[in-house]
Curated annotation (Swiss-Prot):
Active-site annotation: C72, C183
Gene: murI
Gene Ontology MF terms: glutamate racemase activity
Name of the protein described by the UniProt record: Glutamate racemase
Reactions listed under catalytic activity: L-glutamate = D-glutamate
Known role: Provides the (R)-glutamate required for cell wall biosynthesis.
Amino acid sequence: MKQAIGFIDSGVGGLTVVREVLKQLPHEQVYYLGDTARCPYGPRDKEEVAKFTWEMTNFLVDRGIKMLVIACNTATAAALYDIREKLDIPVIGVIQPGSRAALKATRNNKIGVLGTLGTVESMAYPTALKGLNRRVEVDSLACPKFVSVVESGEYKSAIAKKVVAESLLPLKSTKIDTVILGCTHYPLLKPIIENFMGDGVAVINSGEETASEVSALLDYHNLLDSTDEEIEHRFFTTGSTQIFKDIAKDWLNMPDMTVEHIKLGK
């Protein structure tokens, strides 16, 4: 029987990481939990985000996952090291992979980070980037409206274009040549962000690099699945199953997927 890779996120954003993982590892089984009912995590304090992240973690661990991907930047910043220390399965976040990808892409060591308020205030990206390259200069920008645009399914709309243009205006006057999408919801807005920032700016989706690290970690722990056993992906949400399904079907190209509603916390 296949063991699944577990993914947790504040909502649908982590599906951008799932998509990249399934591209690279098509034999793997996925269990995904999106805490849509309590989304967004960005404005919440670190202790509350850590509590919610543990609740999601325990839910998936109880279902026998072999690895955990914290597919949410805010949750990674709040709880990754504590969870990694206490679980006996491999645990990975999305901040280090995104930082590594940005440093590969930049030509002038000037990098912008787009994130939730919680991720920006945590200084997790500047810390990670400077830990890998002390010469790098980082401009961080909180984009609190992006998550709600994605969660409402408006990420291809004229509203999305307006929100992106208004939010990213401060970055246009900087000399950054690389932008990290420091929230896993943001890749759904990537075409609009790329269009606004222009050809000279590389836009980094940490999902691709995260997927490569998932593959390497599974290989290291001898957990890679290459069998043709039947795959049964499972998707859980604390919010609307229909909204979740509409976005997930579009993003993952899984027309027959089912989504289960669950409750977390008290």
